């Protein structure tokens, strides 16, 4: 079984697709890794030789930021934005959309469920 960056790759899938199970590796990065290591993208993960797995593992460790390191970097970037008080940091702090979307009617995913506001009761 191929284990790269602490992730077990699915045995039955093609290597090109199997690598995308690692956080931080999408299809373009996966293709780049396979081209650099000389592994055929159509090979199934279960058919990889130990040398091919080691070549992929070494390339990923040296050239691609994945899993915990990538998550940590993203978290630190957001923390930095919040600390310096930038517009994006303020949006993160208030749990509002960061990338300029309208919020008058939508943005329910980011804002959470509606909260009822108690109004004046008419007699």
UniProtKB/Swiss-Prot annotation:
Record text on subunit structure and interactions: Part of the 30S ribosomal subunit. Forms a loose heterodimer with protein S19. Forms two bridges to the 50S subunit in the 70S ribosome.
Any one of the GO CC terms: cytosol
Gene encoding the protein: rpsM
Lineage top rank: taxon: Bacteria
A Pfam cross-reference name: Ribosomal_S13
Regions annotated as coiled coil: none
Listed InterPro entries: Rbsml_uS13_C (IPR027437), Ribosomal_uS13 (IPR001892), Ribosomal_uS13-like_H2TH (IPR010979), Ribosomal_uS13_bac-type (IPR019980), Ribosomal_uS13_CS (IPR018269)
Upper classification of the organism: Bacteria, Bacillati, Bacillota, Clostridia, Eubacteriales
One GO biological process term: translation
NAD listed as a keyword: no
Family the entry assigns: Belongs to the universal ribosomal protein uS13 family.
Task of the protein: Located at the top of the head of the 30S subunit, it contacts several helices of the 16S rRNA. In the 70S ribosome it contacts the 23S rRNA (bridge B1a) and protein L5 of the 50S subunit (bridge B1b), connecting the 2 subunits; these bridges are implicated in subunit movement. Contacts the tRNAs in the A and P-sites.
Keyword RNA-binding: yes
Region (Disordered) location: 93-123
Organism: Clostridium botulinum (strain Hall / ATCC 3502 / NCTC 13319 / Type A)
Keywords linked to the UniProt accession: Ribonucleoprotein, Ribosomal protein, RNA-binding, rRNA-binding, tRNA-binding
A GO molecular-function annotation: rRNA binding
Protein known as: Small ribosomal subunit protein uS13
